[in-house]
Amino acid sequence: MAREGKRIRAAREGIDPTKVYSLADAVKLIKERAKAKFDETFEISMNLGVDPRHADQMVRGVCNLPNGSGRTVRVAVFARGAKADEAKAAGADIVGAEDLLETIQGGTINFDRCIATPDMMPLVGRLGKVLGPRGLMPNPKVGTVTMDVKGAVGAAKGGAVEFRVEKAGIVHAGIGKVSFDDQKIVENARAFADAVARAKPSGAKGTYIQRIAVSSTMGPGIKVDPASVLAAATA
């Protein structure tokens, strides 16, 4: 514990907790302080002016990160026939129908993203209580219920990140690795923030994007000026 405390203190050194940094400066500070023995994930957290308890203030969507996420994504696809073949050819890790349902019901969930063709949803719907809490339930709003199986698998493998606002009005996601070039992290952060901005619900009132912070997996959070993050939208 003493070693961990020393590492955390060292990571916080030189960071003013009261200051709001530009995105570029925050990225530099985080990369300089990422000393874990693995390639830490670069994370972004956005506080939104919404109350997700109201349906007209729910924020949900997907962002295709221009430089990928840096992580290996295992994709499962519910499909039959030609669409199952399409999924396999596109690189899906697991493809099935009733057999995949039984595997999941048996407690085996060894995938990070789940895609389904529309005709499979009555079957997939039986897994709502299992997949829903894990954020794995296919949903047409984020492109995971679709006939374009090839495109959906490609997007998932290529760095598509789903997001959904939490009860406290926060959206967060991993948007790369600290080993990425600074500019690639900046581009990913801006793409994600823009996707969240475009997903602004009709019921949102006042300032929509209130605060933004970035961090690495093991590092401290750094406050960031929203204006330095939003590339094509305003808070």
Curated annotation (Swiss-Prot):
The keyword Cell wall biogenesis/degradation does not apply. One of its GO terms (cellular component) is cytosolic large ribosomal subunit. One of its GO terms (biological process) is regulation of translation. Keywords: Repressor, Ribonucleoprotein, Ribosomal protein, RNA-binding, rRNA-binding, Translation regulation, tRNA-binding. The keyword rRNA-binding applies. Gene3D superfamilies: 3.30.190.20, 3.40.50.790. One of its GO terms (molecular function) is tRNA binding. SUPFAM superfamilies: Ribosomal protein L1 (SSF56808). InterPro entries: Ribosom_uL1_bac-type (IPR005878), Ribosomal_uL1 (IPR002143), Ribosomal_uL1-like (IPR023674), Ribosomal_uL1/biogenesis (IPR028364), Ribosomal_uL1_3-a/b-sand (IPR016095), Ribosomal_uL1_CS (IPR023673). Transmembrane segments: none annotated. It comes from the Bacteria. Coiled coil: none annotated. Binds directly to 23S rRNA. The L1 stalk is quite mobile in the ribosome, and is involved in E site tRNA release. PANTHER family: 54S RIBOSOMAL PROTEIN L1, MITOCHONDRIAL, LARGE RIBOSOMAL SUBUNIT PROTEIN UL1M. Part of the 50S ribosomal subunit. Belongs to the universal ribosomal protein uL1 family. HAMAP family: Ribosomal_uL1_B. This is Large ribosomal subunit protein uL1. The gene is rplA.
